[in-house]
Amino acid sequence: IVAEPRNASVKRKDGKFVVIKEKTGYTLNMNETFANFKKAVEAEKHQFELDVVKKKAKYTSKDMAEIKDVLGTYTTEYGGSPYGRKVNVANGASKINGSIVYPGETLSVYKTVSPFTKENGYALAGSYENGQTVQTYGGGICQVSTTLYNAVIRAELKIVERFPHSMTVHYVPRSADAAIAGTHKDMKFKNTFDTPIYIEGKANGSTITFTVYGKKKDPKRTVEFLSETTQVKESSESTVSDNTLAEGQKVLESYGHTGY
């Protein structure tokens, strides 16, 4: 008898939205039900009525039918990536694809795409760690969060959390990236609109695209973002003593990186 209500939903099929109807929930009014039971016992009756209360879904089919406008979209290229990285970009996009964010809700990219394991569809590929590139499961997932970030800011949604990479990335202009790493770097955004939004993610082996759908308040409004470098910091040389090397021997651990 007890069942939680389910909000209406949508899915994309053949380039169109299909609305999935909401479901009414049910719960028992325990006080009234117990009172009915007590009366039945006192009257030596074998039956009594359950006081069932309906719980309506918060968002109905009418609300979901409002999702039809493109609020923001963005595409990045990854066709030249190694096989493992391509696998990770496509896998990450598929996990975010179809996400519905209701008004007031916050979507965490890290929670949506993790864990970064072989069992969860990820492969080994390069990722940034302590100023170096190392092989990890899920390497390249930051291109997924970055592409979504750029679609989200064009939809003018609120960014709750966003971090830049420790080094520059090639697939977006400087300052347009959004890194995720463990639980200490995430990309989160909040639906500050009064209608639900739908996230579509597509990866075809060459490009990844995220599109945010919802209800556009002003069809004539457009937004544009510019990347401007205000300061350049050249790298410096750092020498570390290593007793395992022969006297006078030097080994290059890593190249320096220009900061911006």
Protein language model annotation of sequence segments:
Residues 1-260:
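Well-ordered beta-sheet/strand-loop patches within structured domains
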